[in-house]
Amino acid sequence: MVHFTAEEKAAITSLWGKMNVEEAGGEALGRLLVVYPWTQRFFDNFGNLSSPSAILGNPKVKAHGKKVLTSFGDAIKNMDNLKTTFAKLSELHCDKLHVDPENFRLLGNVMVIILATHFGKEFTPEVQAAWQKLVSAVAIALGHKYH
């Protein structure tokens, strides 16, 4: 289990409170699909993913990105119990969707990039460290069913 200090929790929740989940979610998933094109195979039903502009403008990518980022909100509310929080999602992604758990780590890293671009100087090294710890812990929790 990962332990978050009071300072880390404050850094995470402070930024999260300013996050536009819909905008950042679509941007994060879109960036994942552009930068790591092999992840597109999990989104066959999303329509046109033929180019970066098609991906970033795709309404299904934006909608699912919002859903993904909303799940990060659950992580923030349950930082001390991530394994239980993501148990059902881990099972879904492992047993039904067969998603490579490495993709969770990649998405977490993309999330950190999105935060840095959205928050600039406010995204200090200390804030980045807290968020990196969170996205890593979420990736481990999502990959739990695979072990």
UniProtKB/Swiss-Prot annotation:
InterPro entries: Globin (IPR000971), Globin-like_sf (IPR009050), Globin/Proto (IPR012292), Hemoglobin_b (IPR002337), Hemoglobin_oxygen_transport (IPR050056). The modification Phosphoserine is found at S14, S51. The epsilon chain is a beta-type chain of early mammalian embryonic hemoglobin. Belongs to the globin family. Pfam families: Globin (PF00042). The lineage of its organism: Eukaryota, Metazoa, Chordata, Craniata, Vertebrata. One of its GO terms (molecular function) is organic acid binding. This is Hemoglobin subunit epsilon.
